[in-house]
A protein has these predicted regions:
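Non-catalytic cap/lid and distal C-terminal segments of serine-dependent acyl enzymes
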Residues: 1-192
Length: 192
């Protein structure tokens, strides 16, 4: 089953002229909509069709990659794996120097950096499949830097993730994301 859930990025992460506190409060509401309403509905629908609870994998490209990673890293109790393609995993690009409790809570680079090495989530992460991928071609520079930063944090915390940097011909574009999904999905589904 595939569920595609729209974001409110034009009001939140992409609304760089808006009040930062208001923007992140809206995003936090969206986050809770996903984990408090959508996830239980997915389990309900999957249970009706399959008579059992199904694993859930957040997946996204570009800004969706950040959302997928954030959902997974904040709630590994709800998600079994994550596929994030060409994402930014920190708040710098959208919020600049602004930081408060909610921005911190929604910036994987920040909250994973601050996570103690004996935090129970680290064991949970290591029991799941994590793939972060970025190209090194056109429009990927900021994303490549952010992916490098989060890779450093994941490595330092002992979090086993497949962080993959594709070639210099791999652009920030749908054609490449289709190829990456085709490449990674068998691994995530246990077919490889």
């Amino acid at each position: 089953m595939v569920f595609s859930i729209d974001t409110i990025d034009n009001e939140t992460w992409a609304n760089k002229d808006g009040d930062p506190r208001w923007r992140i409060e809206q995003h936090e509401r969206w986050f809770h909509y996903i984990v408090d309403e959508i996830v239980p509905q997915i389990h309900h629908l999957a249970g009706e069709r399959n008579w059992r609870q199904m694993p859930i994998m957040p997946f996204g490209c570009s800004m969706g990659a950040m959302h997928a990673a954030n959902l997974f890293f904040r709630r590994p109790d709800l998600f079994d794996s994550v596929l994030a393609l060409s994402g930014v995993y920190d708040s710098f690009d959208s919020f600049g120097d602004y930081m408060d409790d909610l921005v911190y809570r929604n910036s994987p680079y920040h909250y994973l950096s601050g996570m103690s090495e004996d935090h129970p989530y680290i064991r949970m992460y290591n029991e799941r499949k994590i793939i972060l991928c970025v190209g090194q071609g056109a429009w990927e520079d900021v994303l490549k830097e952010s992916t490098s930063r989060i890779k450093g944090v994941l490595d330092a915390k002992g979090i086993h993730a497949w962080v993959d940097f594709w070639g210099y011909d791999v652009d920030h574009d749908w054609g490449w994301w289709y190829k990456q999904v085709e490449y990674y999905l068998p691994f995530l589904l246990g077919k490889r």
